[in-house]
Amino acid sequence: MVDKIERIKELVEILNKYSYDYYVLDNPSVSDKDYDKKYDELKLLEKETGVVLPYSPTLRIGDIVLDGFNKYTHKGKLWSLDKAQSLDEIKDWHNRNIKFVNDMRAQGEDLPDLKYIATKKFDGLTVNLTYNEEGMLEVSATRGNGEIGENVTAQVKTIKSIPLKLQENHDLFEVHGEAIMTQEAFEKYNSSADSPLKNLRNGAAGALRNLNVKETARRDLSAFFYDVGYKEGYQFKTYLEMMDFIKEKGLPVDDYLKVCVSIEDIKNEIDYIEKIRFDLNYDIDGLVIAIDDIRTRELLGYTVKFPKWAIAYKFEAQEATTKLVDVEWNVGRSGRIGPTAILEPVELAGVTVKRATLNNMDDIKRKGVRIGADVFIRRSNDVIPEIMGTLENTLENSEEIFPPTECPACGSHVVLNGAHYFCENTLSCKPQLVKTIVHYASRDAMNIAGFSEKTAEQLFEKLNIKSISDLYKLKKEDLINLEKFGDKKAENLLNAVEGSKECKLYSFIYALGIPNVGVKTAKDIVNKFKSIDGLKNATFEELVSVQDVGDIVAQDIIEFFKEEKVISTIDELLSLGVNPIFDEVKIVESIFKDKTVVATGTLQNYSRTEIKTKLESLGAKVSGSVSKKTDYVIAGESAGSKLTKAEELGVEVISEEEFEKMLGRES
């Protein structure tokens, strides 16, 4: 029995370390298989012995339903923040701070020059965690009225990035943070939820106030911590010192934390965060600006509601409510008929929104969307916002939305395949054929210069072009009769079509429009199979062995090449002179092999395409965004937010000259 308890302690310590590496450091130190093996061993030992340590990772699964919430009195008050919605309001606050510091100095106080710390204002639910002298998570509570909150310890324990026991601790302390739901967790939850969540904030708040803790665990929340509200023993001298303390304790802290010493600095940070806010995987609604020096904070004090030493700059809302006027059904390249919401115009994040995404009929039903009702809309980084839900008190006199019974473009029969409706008329449905031809001619595909959707529509309507192979049968005398086509434009288009015959194999594969096969996947499968015939005859097992090709993509490829129409089109293209060439990339041994590299800014000796090709020839994985998993950022002139993010994350940044020197050392 004693040996089993010792093993339980050992496994708990090991598994908590693995969780810290994965969820806080974003640096997994063990495979999922090895983690699961140890986790299963721990569960078995706990069942056999009846011993479950209060910081065991098995407590995170939430196998309990509570009767209600108990009240908890915070040791340190959780204050609200005063809000500013313009830079002028920030300036007024800053000027008051300058005057105060000068007045205090005149009275003999030795205060440092003003220094502010800027952090993101997370849009979730505030939580207050209490760790005791032994480092155990004793209580977790909501903010409540700032003095008394609700005990949500069981719910907070489901957040995997929050340590249940600190590695080392001597003083009892309370730490404030924000429980949030990431976009990824939100989408995963909504994909199978009976009642989909309307937004990320409600997802987090609802999870922590759910008495069924298993439901909380399903939401897969995250958290960031940013303030120590109460601490026994040593007291901090600066906010930066406080943040270092939080980080050292193993609590998750956001990477963004900027020192500002002037209004110009603050403005730059506001501009930067507004620029990247829609690229984030979670919601923020502003920027918090706080004085760094704790003594200055103490002297400034508080109003009835707010600390005088901090202010929150609020961004324009990402969400709004408006009326759904109608639903429009549109046909895509694959024949899929998708719904688009037509809205009463509404201002959202500085943009007038008139349309929004509705994914399919299942999405419409789950969200309870009806014509004439008011809907929540959310704008992220997409051009078109998405409908998140419906205001239930506006459903009276609203109309049900019905799926299409025929193709809205050609009137043909429609079929339901999975969650989506499709037009079966692949031979003459205008939107399908026009979009197929436009995709085939696009830059990343066959790169037929000067080819537009307007041109494709004219070719379909006036010249009866119904297949991508028909492009290679065009004649000048046909083209010059089209609107805005003269001799020169006709010749240029014919030359571009002719020039496209000599193409790279991956471009040709991408141009064919295989479902779920983008440029990168096309390159990956071409490097594996090296020819059209090789790909046509590939087995499911061979396809899923290619990096980033999963079961769905593999099945899509197999089904695509089963179509007689596809095979006959490919054969006709080849007979018309299209000659896809496979250029085998020879990977040279390099320091960049298997490294993730991002290039940003203007490079002197490489275009975007050239640096990408060069890096791929060195065996690098080229990414378009910077994360903790990025190994190098090559920064050229006028490098912007990617460079800033790399510096924040501690990613190695090299210049173009340094990049070439690194290559030179290897040759």
From Swiss-Prot:
Enzyme class: ligase
One family name in Pfam for this protein: HHH_5
Active-site positions on this chain: 121 (n6-amp-lysine intermediate)
Database matches in Gene3D superfamilies: 5' to 3' exonuclease, C-terminal subdomain, BRCT domain, DNA ligase/mRNA capping enzyme, Helix hairpin bin, Nucleic acid-binding proteins
Cellular component per GO, a single term: cytosol
Cofactor(s) this protein cannot do without: Mg(2+); Mn(2+)
Ligand binding (NAD(+)): 32-36, 80-81, 143, 178, 314
Domain of life: Bacteria
GO BP annotation list: DNA repair; DNA replication
EC numbers, comma separated: 6.5.1.2
Binding site for Zn(2+): 407, 410, 423, 429
Molecular function GO terms recorded: DNA binding; DNA ligase (NAD+) activity; metal ion binding
Assigned keywords, A-Z: DNA damage, DNA repair, DNA replication, Ligase, Magnesium, Manganese, Metal-binding, NAD, Zinc
Domain BRCT: 587-667
SMART domains cross-referenced by the UniProt entry: BRCT, HhH1, LIGANc
CDD domains for this protein: BRCT_DNA_ligase_like (cd17748), H3TH_FEN1-XPG-like (cd09897), LIGANc (cd00114)
Catalytic activity: NAD(+) + (deoxyribonucleotide)n-3'-hydroxyl + 5'-phospho-(deoxyribonucleotide)m = (deoxyribonucleotide)n+m + AMP + beta-nicotinamide D-nucleotide
InterPro entries xrefs: BRCT_dom, BRCT_dom_sf, DisA/LigA_HHH, DNA_ligase, DNAligase_adenylation, DNAligase_N, Hlx-hairpin-Hlx_DNA-bd_motif, NA-bd_OB-fold
NCBIfam families: dnlj, PRK07956.1
General function of this protein: DNA ligase that catalyzes the formation of phosphodiester linkages between 5'-phosphoryl and 3'-hydroxyl groups in double-stranded DNA using NAD as a coenzyme and as the energy source for the reaction. It is essential for DNA replication and repair of damaged DNA.
Family (UniProt): Belongs to the NAD-dependent DNA ligase family. LigA subfamily.
Name of this protein: DNA ligase
